[in-house]
């Protein structure tokens, strides 16, 4: 949810802007955090100690965030299912000779694929086009030591594959769990918020029902009743019903089910923008129902956690360290220029833009779908499996970071739904995140969506529009002209193509991880998996991709032997 950014295996222009408006002005340059030189290509990652960022403009780091205990997730059906799938990789027969699998893209999908292939005894060779890990969870450090990210990343209790991954890496303590609530701004009451509080003493779905019934500020009782009646088929029909709604937009489904339009105004607009960065007139209802289904089925499903620091170091580097400890490789600055084919149409190699040729026993594309389509060989474009990808297009999104000269009071140690026409969700990261903590200054991180009309606008325009919206959320503390709280600095990160746009009738176009091209596989949240275009979906897609490769390992090994024999004859 609310994850943005992308990894690039082609010459896309990645737009990252930073404007100077005070003596704390930041650099536009991307800053490396733990890179080691490589004789073979690009940069090879090496382990690096985690250092707190230098902060000259206020007192040393001192954490006072009040977090909540990690919820009991291990006994949920989905967590057990995810743990079992992990165990199959560790228990799989050790190969006589590990397969070399070349993977394009070091976002969560590529990292997940590589991690579980390494668990199965194979050798992943991970190639990332940029000089930073993470893809849609990438982040950069400015010259002041402050981090700015591609998105505001939230980890839900209903993310069993992500939660398993944290446990397997031994980093559960890096998630800062917040109060089990959802907090919405009240547009008609500037500066005020409305809460949905989930009681710990009740099981699901009663805790969610109680939270909705107890909130009398956003929906009236008649609206709640009609909303509940509209959701009954989803509760009773389960996953088959949810999948059958793929062809309807949120608004079309509401009309069909007799749900009042105010439910969209009060709830679904905020959910749609948080889940997929678009409004409910465009979003497939399946997307909303998948989220609601998970939240209602699992007691802690809607409970949220923040990562305790920047994602490249706090999440991605532990995965890289794990992969390397099992013999895998991770290379940065290794952009794919071309997928070279054999005479039979299978992959011969990946040609990098630095001239290097990468060969393997199998190949994975774990980039965004837009990058895959750009590099798709002409010989493959007539295959229905690849033709269906045309419907899948990344959605634009903008992530905004603003450092203020004071500590804002009208905020919470939590994710907040702005219910603004321009903004989606936001958080005061100086409160919610340990690494970004500041006792004297707030740093608001905000998702600017929908962004289609703004992606080409200047950073100054985006900041001015953001400040106008913030003046409504903080009427006593922020004004658009900065006559109240003043901006010390800001960063604007634009992503022209983020997660795929989940419009109606996309589901049949999502590809399974095993392609019809022998030895070629896909990973990414756009591929077929039961979760949303999200961090959870990316991790699960990588796991399913690794599973397909392990299942095909004997075939792939035989292909490799034939290739070697042919090469020796020549």
Curated annotation (Swiss-Prot):
It is a peripheral membrane protein. Pfam families: Amino_oxidase. This is 15-cis-phytoene desaturase, chloroplastic/chromoplastic. One of its GO terms (molecular function) is FAD binding. It is found in: Plastid, Chloroplast; Plastid, Chromoplast; Membrane. Belongs to the carotenoid/retinoid oxidoreductase family. Gene3D superfamilies: FAD/NAD(P)-binding domain (3.50.50.60). Keywords: Carotenoid biosynthesis, Chloroplast, Chromoplast, FAD, Flavoprotein, Membrane, NAD, Oxidoreductase, Plastid, Transit peptide. PANTHER family: 15-CIS-PHYTOENE DESATURASE, CHLOROPLASTIC_CHROMOPLASTIC, PROTOPORPHYRINOGEN OXIDASE. It comes from the Eukaryota. FAD binds at residues 105-121, 128-129, 136, 153-154, 159, 336, 525, 535. Substrate binds at residues 294, 533. Its EC number is 1.3.5.5. Pathway: Carotenoid biosynthesis; lycopene biosynthesis. GO terms for cellular component: chloroplast; chromoplast; membrane. Its main location: plastid. It comes from Glycine max (Soybean). It catalyses: 2 a plastoquinone + 15-cis-phytoene = 9,9',15-tri-cis-zeta-carotene + 2 a plastoquinol. Homotetramer. InterPro entries: Amino_oxidase (IPR002937), FAD/NAD-bd_sf (IPR036188), Phytoene_desaturase (IPR014102), Zeta_carotene_desat/Oxidored (IPR050464). GO terms for biological process: carotene biosynthetic process; carotenoid biosynthetic process; protein homotetramerization.
């Amino acid at each position: 949810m609310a994850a943005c950014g992308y990894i690039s295996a082609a010459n896309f222009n990645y737009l990252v802007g930073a404007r100077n408006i005070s003596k704390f002005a930041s650099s536009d340059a991307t800053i490396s955090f733990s890179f080691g030189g490589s004789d073979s290509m690009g940069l090879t990652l090496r382990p690096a100690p985690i250092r707190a960022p230098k902060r000259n403009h206020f007192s040393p780091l001192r954490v006072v965030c009040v977090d909540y205990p990690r919820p009991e997730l291990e006994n949920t059906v989905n967590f057990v299912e995810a743990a079992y799938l992990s165990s199959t990789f560790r228990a799989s027969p050790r190969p006589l000779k590990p397969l070399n699998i070349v993977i394009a893209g070091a976002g969560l999908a590529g990292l997940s694929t590589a991690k579980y292939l390494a668990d199965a005894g194979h050798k992943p060779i991970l190639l990332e086009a940029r000089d930073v890990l993470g893809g849609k969870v990438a982040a950069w450090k400015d010259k002041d030591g402050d981090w700015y990210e591609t998105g505001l990343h939230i980890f839900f209790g209903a993310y069993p594959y992500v939660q398993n991954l944290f446990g397997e890496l031994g980093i559960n303590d890096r998630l800062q769990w917040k109060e089990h609530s959802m907090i919405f701004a009240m547009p008609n009451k500037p500066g005020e918020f409305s809460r949905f509080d989930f009681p710990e003493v009740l099981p699901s779905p009663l805790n969610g029902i109680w939270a909705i019934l107890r909130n009398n500020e956003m929906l009236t009782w008649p609206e709640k009743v009609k909303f509940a009646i509209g959701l009954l088929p989803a509760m009773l029909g389960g996953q088959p019903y949810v999948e059958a709604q793929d062809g309807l937009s949120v608004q079309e489904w509401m009309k069909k089910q007799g749900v009042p339009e105010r439910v969209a105004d009060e709830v679904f607009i905020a959910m749609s923008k948080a889940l997929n960065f678009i409004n409910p007139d465009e979003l497939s209802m399946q997307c909303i129902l998948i989220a609601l289904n998970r939240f209602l089925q699992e007691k802690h499903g809607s409970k949220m956690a923040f990562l305790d620091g920047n994602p490249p170091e706090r999440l991605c580097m532990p995965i890289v360290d794990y992969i390397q400890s099992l013999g895998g490789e991770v290379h940065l600055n290794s952009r794919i220029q071309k997928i070279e084919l054999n005479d039979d149409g299978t992959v011969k190699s990946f040609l990098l833009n630095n001239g290097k040729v990468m060969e393997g026993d199998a190949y994975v594309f774990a980039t965004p779908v837009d990058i895959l389509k750009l590099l798709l060989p002409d010989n493959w474009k007539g295959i229905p499996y690849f033709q269906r990808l045309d419907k899948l297009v990344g959605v634009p999104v903008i992530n905004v970071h603003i450092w203020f000269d004071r500590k804002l009071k009208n905020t919470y140690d939590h994710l907040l739904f702005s219910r603004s026409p321009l903004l989606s969700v936001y958080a005061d990261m100086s409160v919610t995140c340990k690494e970004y903590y500041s006792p004297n200054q707030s740093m608001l991180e905000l998702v600017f969506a929908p962004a289609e009309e703004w992606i080409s606008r200047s950073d100054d325009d985006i900041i001015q529009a953001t400040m106008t919206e913030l003046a409504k959320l903080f009427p006593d503390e922020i004004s658009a002209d900065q006559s109240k709280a003043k901006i010390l600095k800001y960063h604007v990160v634009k992503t022209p193509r983020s997660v795929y746009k989940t419009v109606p009738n996309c589901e049949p176009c999502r590809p399974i991880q095993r392609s019809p091209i022998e030895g070629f596989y896909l990973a990414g949240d756009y591929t077929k998996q039961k979760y949303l275009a999200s961090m959870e979906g990316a991790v699960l897609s990588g796991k399913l991709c690794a599973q397909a490769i392990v299942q095909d390992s004997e075939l792939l090994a035989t292909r490799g032997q034939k290739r070697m024999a042919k090469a020796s004859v020549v």
